[in-house]
Amino acid sequence: MSKFSFFNYRINMRNSHATSLRFIKFNYSEFKNIRNFSSEKKRDPKLSLFLNNVSKILSEHKKDLHKAQEIIEREWLKLATPSTDVKSDITSTMYTKHRLIHDRAFDLLKLYKSNGNLNKISKSLKDYIVNEKFIFIAWSYLLASYSKSSLTNLDYRIGYSITRHIYTEYYKDEFMSFDDFSNYNKFDVGFFVKLGDIFINTFTSPLNPIFERVFENEIYSLKINKEYENEIMESLVISPKALPMVCPPLPWGHGIRGGNLINLTDTQDESLVVGSFHHRHKIAITDKLYNVINKLNAFKFKINGDLLSYLQNEGSFILDFYKNTKKDTYINNMITIDIARTYLNTPFYLNVNIDWRGRIYTQSFYLDYQGSELSLALINLFEGKKLDEKGLFFFYVYGANIYNDGGKFSKKSFQDRFNWVVENLDNIIAMDKEFILKAESPTLFAAFCLTMRKLKENPDYPVFNPIFLDATCSGVQHFAAMLLDLELGKYVNLINSGESVNDFYSQLIPAINKAINESAEKKFKNLKFSDISLNRSLLKKVIMTKSYNVTTYGITEQLKSKLEKVEKIVISKGKEIKVYDYLVPTKNGDFVVLDTFEVETLASIINDNIFNQFPKLHSIYDYLTRLAKIYLKLDIPLSWSTPDGLELTQRYNLSKVKKLTINFLGKNRTAVLRSWVNEKDSRREVQAIIPNIIHSLDASHLTMIIDSWDSYILPIHECFGTHPNDMYKLAEQVRECFILLYSKNDFLNKIDYKFRENLKDYKIEIVNKNGEDFVKIKGNKRYEYLPLPVLPQMGELNVEDIRDMGKYMIS
């Protein structure tokens, strides 16, 4: 028993909620003292035991980092293997030194078994689940995903992972597959959720309240108990998949596994393609895409040591600022800082994967260029360069971009942004606290300022910071080029002969607000809407995602995440439930208060009116959705080819929802479970066709750029990063590949041609009536005729003009 353990085994029978349960009898004063000790002590500057051991491995094998990476991965596998009695070196000190969080969680798990709380677990698992290593697995899942997953999803992932581990270690020789093992034992979604909930309970129990279960907006989730922040940082356990690699990842190829040196995946065979395995999407990966992934994986990075030191000393006010304004990200920020400290003197690589559409995602969780602002700011290119004239210019432009001063700079010319930095050099070098915190991205701007200090001291200083430029609503850029719509192309800066940046979002806002105001009397009889005036910050993401066919529900959720909330308690079925009203800005600078239903109504108005200025957008939406409906009606796979040769097939399986009551230790919780069946989800097939095609075109464009690029490139979907010296050429390459995408590849005509060829292959007859084509389908009693969608009329945009007039295509 641990020295500080406050468990004892004097079991006392108590009743709770009319259920006879066994509870532990413990010393509450001792418990309170331990809580106070944990919450009041200052942040220990030492790394967690886990990261300290990783650091030791890196130090001991700094001349052979391939060996270091292999040791880190193998030690993790030892930790995750249930049967071994050998302690993993990477966590050996965690077994021998005091570990409050893990000790308490494991003591609770043992207690649940001794009290009979695990009796309902399957016999196949019951004898194996009380294993300390599963506590570590659950803990690592919780740390990585608590802030972005529902409680039920966490339950499922942990329960599934632990079951998979037990199958691999004890039952793999008895069953052909994990699915056979699960089917034989009748392990369904509900079983995995209940098993996972037992392990999560070891971290939410009053005896180990590291996380708090909260119920908001009809969803259970977890929040960090702030009293235990220090203890959490001391108890970090992180899978190598969530960490950078210190040697080049293995190359991927046809039938060849790449990435980590060892297969670390516990749920399925490791694959380059990640995403939901509940559906049956397909991608035929080309040699070009494999080459692109391997090129990205080979880029070497290092920690921005100047920024790390600054944040831990005089710049700690930035982390305090995030702690006060974005409290839910504080722990992740602290973990990111500690990982950066661990890898400070070691070069590293960042694994990437793709989804079935070819979109590229970084695998590392806390330290990666697609992650948080802090994560991005701490990453430097391993190879620096002295800034040339264009490099200095774009470095200054980037500095203005990340300061942005309330969105002012994103609409200004590159020269105006450059001039702003020149005019504010004294403030930039001084790095005054108030000046830094006014930046839109304070951490990135601090990194910029620190480099500017170095450049002032030595103009020949080699710069290691990557810089980034963003596309202007890339989804609409693709539609404009696809439709050759000149007006739309101007709005999204494909064609721009001036020196100011066209702001697509601001162009749409007046019409959207007018529609909202007019709806107050005409349709919804809600006078609250008559004075509403939504601004750019509220509508930018809505407009951007509408080009990907976001639904009214999606718009509602986006608005709710942006609007200021007012909490209130309502009584529903005899229970108190926390709900929110929302403060919506008005024309006179005040607010109106809308409830959730009214926000949904507001979202509906926006959805119906958002693109009224651009009828051709409606025509392409109509064409693609009608195409999808015919594919579904004929039960033909919905597939298309991207311009760079990817063959993609979209297939969403239907999900069924049921409610499961989880009863553990006398407490009930209702979980909503989703299970998938091998039937097409017709609604989602139609709804998803537009975003999936656009995402695949984004991916195709990026693949073409990376394949033809010889320097660093850091892709963040529609955002492009590289060394400042290379940004001018990269911007040119972005335009050239976009022109190639749409000048030599008539995408819409090819989709239409393939659609008609598919009909022929499936012996579907096309008939013409009065100049209109119909698909002839044999029904139960008679033939049915479905009108074929007609391609939208093309406009007058010459995509070749983008080369010279698309300067602000990315800005």
Swiss-Prot record:
Primary location recorded for the protein, binned into one broad class: mitochondrion
Signal peptide: none
Protein name listed in UniProt: Probable DNA-directed RNA polymerase
Record GO biological process: mitochondrial transcription
Annotated source species: Neurospora intermedia
Family, similarity comment: Belongs to the phage and mitochondrial RNA polymerase family.
Active site residues of this protein: D470, K540, E718
Catalytic EC class: transferase
Keyword check for Mitochondrion: yes
Functional description taken from the UniProt entry: DNA-dependent RNA polymerase catalyzes the transcription of DNA into RNA using the four ribonucleoside triphosphates as substrates.
Pfam families: RNA_pol
EC numbers for this chain: 2.7.7.6
Keywords assigned by UniProt, alphabetized: DNA-directed RNA polymerase, Mitochondrion, Nucleotidyltransferase, Plasmid, Transcription, Transferase
Cysteines joined through disulfide linkages: none
Ranges in a coiled coil: none
Keyword Transcription: yes
InterPro entries (alphabetical): DNA-dir_Rpol_C_phage-type, DNA-dir_Rpol_phage-type, DNA/RNA_pol_sf
Bilayer-crossing regions: none
Known catalytic reactions: RNA(n) + a ribonucleoside 5'-triphosphate = RNA(n+1) + diphosphate
